[in-house]
Amino acid sequence: MTESLMGRSACFTLLLGCLLLTGCATTRFEKQAFNNEASAGIKKIAVQQWNDQDEYYARVLNHPGASFGLVGAVIMAADTAQKTKKLNDALDPRNTKLTADFYAKALPGLRQAGYEVVAVPVTRGAQPNLAKDVVRVTKDQDAYLLLTFEGGYLAAGASTAYYPFVAMTAELNDSKSQAVLYKEAYHYGYNSGNKDVVHIEAAADCKFADIDKLVADIEKTRACLTASVDILVNQMVADLKK
């Protein structure tokens, strides 16, 4: 197992912890329902547009290695990297454009909901403050929409099934006052038990007994991820409809 793969595995561990908690903080995720009447003046919005993932993770959340200190952590990272590589060798992120598919439907959906939309490209790995600022300073906007969007496969334990997991957060801010006009978190597929998110079930057959089953029918594995796109787009657009 290469150091780069293990390093990415460690990043996945941190990232997923953030996604499952909808934020790397001890406080609860603070939702904000969209108030159409109060936001009547919002016409033009800048939308944070992330590029696609270069890998889709395959991770066991409660890995046995987590109980054995530093050595266990190394074993866990290596195992996660191996499973992630196995998934991506079959799935091929170049043929699985989950994020691009999301924006291809979300941007027109927001326009149909009554907004003028400007997409602002942001590169994955950018510092959160910089990723926010590049959207916040877009010229002549009334509000800006911050998004996170990440997908992969999760299993609760070493002997439990893998489920698709796509996590998305959306936050609309007033450009002048910086007030939060809308804030919501969505989880598709794997149920983390987090009561602060909108959880959306995946299809019943999107359940894979182990990593070998996960890659045995890769078209089904891909479809179980991409099925999230329409669901999440429709949910967000409905929330923000004018």
Residue ranges and their predicted role:
Residues 111-129:
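Short beta-strand->alpha-helix linker/helix-N-cap micro-motif
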Residues 25-31, 124-179:
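Surface-exposed short loop/turn segments
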